[in-house]
Design a protein with these regions (language model features):
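Nucleic-acid-binding surface
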Residues: 1-135
Length: 135
């Protein structure tokens, strides 16, 4: 429903983790990303949690998926992991750690792919020790 009423939004963070089967968390809200200067869509249901991305960050690592007949723009696996570290104060460090662990151990993305998006999100210093531990 969100994708139909707001086709420009990108599903991210906990919603993207759930779509990629990378978390045990069940988000109570739909997490969406919008550009810095965009207005968030107004919807009474489902509840939306909006985060703002820079133009470069919003364009990087977005893929289109077909879910229940709707075309969704979703952040890819390595981009979602980097975003979780960027917004770790919102999603929690535990969620970010679970995401990077499941991604690397499950071979859903390589360390280099995650690192590329960490550079886009400017979280290399935060993410480096965790990636080194998993290497």
């Amino acid at each position: 429903e969100v994708a139909q009423r707001a086709p420009r939004v990108v599903f991210c963070l906990l919603t993207a983790l759930r779509l990629h089967d990378l978390t045990t968390q069940l988000p109570h809200e739909v997490w969406i990303a919008i550009g810095n200067k965009e207005h968030p869509p107004r919807m009474s249901y489902p509840r939306l949690r909006t985060v703002r991305f820079s133009t470069a960050s919003l364009a990087a690592g977005v893929e289109t998926r077909e879910v229940e007949g709707a075309r969704l723009r979703v952040t890819g696996v390595p981009k979602t992991v980097a975003d979780c570290f960027k917004f770790r104060s919102k999603v929690g460090l535990g969620v970010a750690l679970e995401a990077v662990r499941e991604t690397i151990r499950g071979r859903r993305a390589t360390i280099d792919e995650v690192w590329r998006y960490a550079r886009v999100d400017r979280v290399q210093k935060v993410l480096r020790p965790y990636l080194e531990a998993l290497a």
